[in-house]
């Protein structure tokens, strides 16, 4: 579960390395899970890239340490909390996605992120 002040690693090549959650988008929502959109501040970035430190960006959560229960009864969890930076059209800013992503992103219409990911769990 991601909440305000949570740090996430960035799983794409947009230039950011770490982001900090400012707000979970939605009507008065407290926690973000896989597939939710958050507003975040870039805390660590690579030089000469698309995003800079202290930029405010939108991102979609692709991995969480919290256990994710599926309707089939399976449960999965990842080793880190990670997000992919997106633009206003829900397309990723980067051209590559690193690491596995959850299958729930396809159901939430983030098909571009799913197609760029090396593995969908």
Curated annotation (Swiss-Prot):
Residues forming coiled coils: none
Keyword Ribonucleoprotein: yes
Gene Ontology CC, one term: cytosolic large ribosomal subunit
CDD domains listed in its UniProt record: Ribosomal_uL14 (cd00337)
Biological processes annotated in GO: translation
An example Gene Ontology molecular-function term: structural constituent of ribosome
Domain of life: Bacteria
Keyword field: Ribonucleoprotein, Ribosomal protein, RNA-binding, rRNA-binding
Entry keyword Chloroplast: no
Listed InterPro entries: Ribosomal_uL14, Ribosomal_uL14_bac-type, Ribosomal_uL14_sf
SMART domains: Ribosomal_L14 (SM01374)
Family: Belongs to the universal ribosomal protein uL14 family.
Record note on quaternary structure: Part of the 50S ribosomal subunit. Forms a cluster with proteins L3 and L19. In the 70S ribosome, L14 and L19 interact and together make contacts with the 16S rRNA in bridges B5 and B8.
HAMAP family, A to Z: Ribosomal_uL14
Role of this protein: Binds to 23S rRNA. Forms part of two intersubunit bridges in the 70S ribosome.
Protein name (database record): Large ribosomal subunit protein uL14
Lineage of producing organism: Bacteria, Bacillati, Cyanobacteriota, Cyanophyceae, Synechococcales
